[in-house]
């Protein structure tokens, strides 16, 4: 085998996702595979989602690929490192060239190269991976796993842009940046036929009674939110034509039985002109779909909501991250919280579901900001919302902001933790925010029971108990944090 594409996500190791059970296939790998196929490069995809580490190890030993390409993100870092260690430990795989790509590698070059990677593809990977594969296929690479491995990489791979590798003296070398693909209509449809997509559809069907597929229509995001990583596609905006996207939808409808589409784009309604053309193309070709997407409140209005509904949208996720304008501004979100509420409400009035995202524990956030966020959720009244506690991803503005403060945080070795494990000094201790999340969630749900006339129901009383318990936890950790810091500035005020 020439090239094997895989990743390190195993559903059986993710108890949260097992409860949610909304898995999607690795589109990035499937796009790489399709690009390689288009240019005549033999490749296979081993999808780990429904598999096991043992299955992957056995596959590697049986097929002995010349190139092992691993997609790497924050969630899969530890497993990817484990896969590399397995390859390096087996003499049968000594010729295997390990290539990493994905959002977590760009700002962690030294760590991944030290952990066993031969090459790292920085940014978009299609053309980079093609050139690596052609180099190996042309026998310019004869890696033997010996002491001269770094010399071989230097002499055979240094002509390829957009990669990083170690020089013989151990230092990390980056070639010139890879130019981004401007016309992404040139990309073939993802190679979904190389994995068992029915496993995903069946998992959805068993858990929810319907199934879903994912589609990407754009690359890059022009916004500068300080907590968000743009490590792969950068701060750009490139869009497939509406015709090309509808072609893919029709192709999927012809080959698979699914109910919903999840558009994975960061801001689906960023271009109103594109959105209108997309609707026209769907209607012209009489293509019926139901889908959900993500967007920003400032890229929505009544006309956009109407077009989304015409297209078949049933749910819109509208980013906010906070109900406090002060925190939104600190995040560089460049959106007005009142506009977020208005768009959530307008979306629901139009007959679609509205979801939103919230982040607690951002630098500078106080209990007053958390209260404003909870009030925001009560007033906006989205159908769905998710809450996370802020963590710094390397390469983001948030990471740069708190990096100096992270130095004193005790962490395991780099290869044994992810950015999610990193903490930094906040207004309150880290445990405080776990209770703040519970308080916010249950407060909003209790408010919904009031609006539906179930204030004294069993469900409403359960929410009240959870609110009191969460509030007690917030008070405890707030007082404990103030005591540890020697501060006397903690006044216990009720939250209403």
Positions of the model-derived regions?
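Acidic, low-complexity intrinsically disordered segments
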Residues: 1-246, 255
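Radical SAM enzyme core and accessory elements
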Residues: 2-5, 42, 57-60, 66, ...
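Flexible glycine/acidic-rich beta-alpha junction loops that bind and position SAM and/or redox cofactors
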Residues: 12-14, 223, 273, 326, ...
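Short helix-capping segments at alpha-helix termini
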Residues: 40, 89-95, 283-288, 349-352, ...
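Short acidic/polar active-site loop segments enriched in Thr and Asp
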Residues: 66, 118, 258-259, 314, ...
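Catalytic cores of alpha/beta
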Residues: 109-114, 304, 364-379
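Radical SAM [4Fe-4S] cluster-binding motif and immediate context
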Residues: 190-357, 375
